Every structure is written in structure tokens, then in C-alpha cells.
A protein has these predicted regions:
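Glycan-recognition and catalytic cores of secretory/periplasmic carbohydrate-active enzymes
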Residues: 1-196
Length: 196
């Protein structure tokens, strides 16, 4: 999948390497973190720079994998805590602002096409039988907003956590012991889970 999404998946492990540096002070971890950041999170587009300038919204990037992209920005935020470069914080804040403007649905999730940013704020009312608004995207957005809330103190991030938690996250909980046979495309009472 690294080739499919421009290397974004591989870049999403930035956060653990920054944390390893914080725990050990081993410069190799910091150097590797800085290498990941130097890629701009994608082999064919500098997503970090695009977020600093708000030139394009996340659904307009060459690669739009929501969970991995947000994980990359979680790592950049952790790096900001180490180095204190306000430009890094600006990139993360702008990224989340753009997600909330273009890819945040009424229930508090993103990605009406699987787990991809796809202008969900507009597309959320389109009929679809496909997989959409995956829980991994909800949880990662909530985590990123929790970190921004701690750093900035801006209550808008608490609002996102609340909306996403009470709607998208709790709505995804299977409290009825329902089973799913994904390989067969059947879930619960014979309804298709994935169009076949």
C-alpha cells in the first residue's frame, strides 16, 4: 500500500519515532523523524506545505487516505512539542481546520468513500451502499483534536470530540452481538455489508 498512497502509510509512524527520541534522547530517532517530515508525507506532493498555505484541502491532495494522513499530522504535532517550530503547529491546525470545513459530516466522521477524504461535508447526503465513515477515521480525528485542545486550549476541538464521540463513535458500537461475514458480504439480517 505504500506505493498506492504515495508513501503516506510509511510516514504515519512518525509519532512513535518522535516519542522514542523523547524517551531515549537517541539522535538517530530524531534524524529519522526529520527525514520523514522532509518527505512532506508523500512521494509526489508536499502535504505539509500545502497545509501551511491552505493551497488545497485534504480531499484535493494526490493521496487522500484519511486515517494515515491524520496519523502523520499527529506525528508532526508530537515533533512540534520537541522542537517548538510554530510552522509545524500551523500546518497541523490548518490541516484540521480544512478537514472540518470540507470533510466533516453531521455525525462527526469523515470519508464517504471508504476511509478517504472526499469532500464528505458535501457528499454525506448522497445515497451509497458502500463502506463509508469508518471508525478508525473517527477515533484518529478525536485523538488529533484532543492533542490540539491540550496544546492550544481552543474549545472547538472539544466540540469535535463531543460530536464525534456521541454520534459516529457510539453509533458504531455493536451492542447487540451482531455478527458479520465480510467475506460473504452479509451482515446481520441478510443485508449486504459490501456490494458484490
Amino acid at each position: 500500500t505504500t506505493n498506492i498512497y504515495g508513501g503516506m502509510h510509511s510516514c504515519s509512524l512518525l509519532e512513535p519515532f518522535v516519542k522514542l527520541y523523547k524517551l531515549t534522547a537517541e539522535k538517530n530517532y530524531l534524524d529519522f523523524s526529520e527525514y520523514i517530515i522532509s518527505t512532506g508525507f508523500s512521494k509526489d506532493q508536499d502535504i505539509i506545505s500545502l497545509c501551511k498555505t491552505k493551497e488545497k484541502r485534504p480531499f484535493e491532495f494526490n493521496h487522500t487516505k484519511a486515517y494515515e494522513m491524520m496519523s502523520c499530522f499527529e506525528g508532526l504535532l508530537e515533533y512540534y512539542k520537541v522542537k517548538g517550530d510554530e510552522e509545524d503547529l500551523k500546518a497541523v491546525v490548518n490541516f484540521v481546520d480544512m478537514v472540518l470545513e470540507s470533510d466533516y459530516t453531521i455525525i462527526g466522521c469523515s470519508g464517504c468513500t471508504h476511509e478517504l477524504f472526499d469532500n464528505s461535508s458535501v457528499k454525506q447526503t448522497n445515497y451509497s451502499e458502500g463502506v463509508m465513515q469508518e471508525t478508525c477515521v473517527t477515533v484518529t480525528l478525536m485523538k488529533l483534536c484532543a492533542r490540539l485542545l491540550m496544546i492550544t486550549g481552543d474549545s472547538k476541538y472539544a466540540d469535535v470530540i463531543e460530536r464525534s464521540g456521541y454520534n459516529a463513535l457510539f453509533g458504531a458500537v455493536n451492542s447487540e452481538n451482531q455478527t458479520m461475514k465480510r467475506a460473504l458480504g452479509i451482515v446481520w439480517k441478510g443485508k449486504e455489508a459490501v456490494p458484490v
